[in-house]
Amino acid sequence: MTVEIFPCNDKSITKTLVFSSGLGGHANFWQPQIDFFTQHFQVLCYDQQGVQQDSELLSSNYQLKDLATELVDILKCNNLSSCHFVGHALGAFIGLEVAAQAPQLLEKLVLLNPWDELDFYTLKCFNLRQSLLEHTGIGAYVKAQAIFLYPPQWISENAQILTEQENQAIVKFAPIPNVLARLNSLKAYQPKTTAATVNHPTLVISNADDTLVPWQRGLSLTQNMPHAKFNLMATGGHASTVTQAAMMNQTILKFLI
């Protein structure tokens, strides 16, 4: 497992900001955030268990709570407490579970494109991706991903870099049983009950043009949390930290400081 800690540019600042990725699980998802947020915080990013090409197989009953326990262990091993947290989709739910399991470890939460319960539309998207992986192969699974993550115009304008990233992802693809175990754990997770118990100040951000998660699900999650605010962005797609990085960074920072 890879854990990366980037010191704050201001050495007097020790507050840590933790970033947790979505279904892909890789730390490099947050590359557009590193330089900006290390002006204000120490930043921790990590590869989630099972996402490397040479990863051991995950257990057959792998659950979202296992991902939360993994992050708790990372924070404790690095002597970190009272961190701010930013999580994307699956990563957002890791934050919810950590806030429930070990509330003292987190201070403020930012949840990007989460849901209160799995929408039928999102389930159809997940089932389609699973079918591609099981019946067509790794290449089709990886190359379809952009359709769910990014707006059409962004895909058109970034064809070369996107193709390069896809080719690298195919070569470095995780064991297929791990990808399916992680997807099934996300499909099975019910965040609504846990969210209602989380008392941390929370910002939920959804995107109106998200082609994977209807933004109304983010609003519903916000309404189920005692201390949450909701921000709806007009554009950016599901991965707006990539496509609208500057706007997202400013929105997140304004909430955290």
Label for each model-derived stretch:
Residues 44-86:
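Active-site loop/oxyanion-hole signature of alpha/beta-hydrolase fold enzymes
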Residues 211-217:
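Conserved alpha/beta-hydrolase "acid-adjacent" motif
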Residues 87-91, 95:
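Gly/Ala-rich beta-loop-alpha elbow adjacent to hydrolase catalytic centers
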Residues 198, 204-206, 210:
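Short beta-strand/loop motif that positions the catalytic acidic residue
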Residues 100, 107-136:
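Flexible "cap/lid" loop of the alpha/beta hydrolase fold
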Residues 5-57:
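Conserved HGGG/HGGXW glycine-rich cap/lid loop of the alpha/beta-hydrolase fold
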Residues 236-245, 249:
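Catalytic histidine-centered segment of alpha/beta-hydrolase-like enzymes
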Residues 120-122, 140-194:
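Conserved alpha/beta-hydrolase catalytic His-Asp/Glu region
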